[in-house]
């Protein structure tokens, strides 16, 4: 009994350290999710402005084309006034086209900028999750013959992280982010990019959810270890503390 009591604080302390590490890394991943959501919001705002600009440009082009057609049709009768109407109509139509072209250029520049930003976020998340995977792998080995429920939570968190890492590797490839030629720099390519960003956010959120579940399991075990004096049921190793600070 004295031996178990001596081991209890060490086991509880190791679990607390590990839980603190998980919460810290979980917070960092959540920050990246927030950054991705902000990128998606910016794309949505630009999409709406672009849609309004395209509608305005189309209206101007239609009005200008109508004026030009009417002016040309009247030119044999009233040469001077009709040609002026045609010139004004063509000018209005050109202005409408300029609005649309400017909107398309904004899509090109914005998409390029946001793609670089998302790739940076994905690379940061990948590094963070690799660190977490190393720690979780050691935790599962350390907990191997201990609490099976806690071990399963650790494995679930590892699986979620593995899936997200694989997704990020695929996500970071050029072909996945860069619009295809068939899409071009259009609202379609922007919508596709936004959908991909949302998919990446969902993948990262699945990781934070698994880490939250493991953290709750750790908290309950720490309380059990402290209040019920059952720290001897948790395997303890001096290597765990060293592994928590990789």
Curated annotation (Swiss-Prot):
In terms of Pfam families, this protein maps to: ApoL
Question: Which conditions up-regulate this protein?
Answer: In the brain, by electrical or chemical seizures (at protein level).
The protein's location, in the record's own words, is:
Cell membrane; Cell junction; Cytoplasmic vesicle, Secretory vesicle
Regions that span the bilayer: 50-72, 89-109
Membrane topology recorded in Swiss-Prot or TrEMBL:
Multi-pass membrane protein
Q: Where in this chain does the entry annotate a coiled-coil region?
A: 193-220
Going by the UniProt record, its keywords in alphabetical order are: Cell junction, Cell membrane, Coiled coil, Cytoplasmic vesicle, Membrane, Transmembrane, Transmembrane helix
Q: In which tissues is it expressed?
A: Present at low levels in brain vascular cells (at protein level).
Per the record's keyword annotation, is Transmembrane helix included, yes or no?
A: yes
Signal sequence annotation: none
Family per similarity comment: Belongs to the apolipoprotein L family.
Q: What does this protein do?
A: Is a modulator of endothelial barrier permeability, required for proper organization of endothelial cell-cell junctions and cytoskeleton. It also plays a role in the modulation of secretory autophagy. May affect blood-brain barrier permeability.
Note the PANTHER family from the entry: APOLIPOPROTEIN L (PTHR14096), APOLIPOPROTEIN L DOMAIN-CONTAINING PROTEIN 1 (PTHR14096:SF1)
- This protein is called what? Apolipoprotein L domain-containing protein 1
């Amino acid at each position: 009994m004295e031996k178990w009591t001596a081991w209890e604080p060490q086991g509880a302390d190791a679990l607390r350290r590990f839980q603190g590490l998980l919460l810290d890394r979980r917070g960092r991943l959540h920050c990246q999710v927030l950054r991705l959501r902000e990128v998606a919001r910016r794309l949505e705002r630009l999409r709406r402005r672009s849609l309004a600009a395209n509608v305005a440009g189309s209206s101007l082009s239609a009005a200008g084309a109508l004026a030009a057609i009417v002016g040309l049709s009247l030119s044999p009768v009233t040469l001077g006034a009709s040609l002026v109407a045609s010139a004004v109509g063509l000018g209005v139509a050109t202005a409408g086209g300029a609005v649309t072209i400017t909107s398309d250029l904004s899509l090109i520049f914005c998409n390029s900028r946001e793609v670089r930003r998302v790739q940076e976020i994905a690379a940061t998340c990948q590094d963070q999750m690799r660190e977490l995977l190393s720690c979780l792998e050691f935790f599962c080995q350390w907990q191997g013959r201990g609490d099976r429920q806690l071990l399963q939570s650790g494995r679930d968190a590892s699986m979620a992280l593995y899936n997200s890492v694989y997704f990020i590797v695929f996500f970071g490839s050029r072909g996945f982010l860069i619009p295809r030629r068939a899409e071009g720099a259009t609202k379609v390519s922007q919508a596709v990019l936004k959908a991909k960003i949302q998919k990446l956010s969902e993948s990262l959120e699945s990781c934070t959810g698994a880490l939250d579940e493991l953290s709750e399991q750790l908290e309950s075990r720490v309380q059990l270890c402290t209040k019920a004096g059952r720290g001897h049921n948790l395997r303890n190793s001096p290597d765990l503390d060293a592994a928590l600070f990789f």
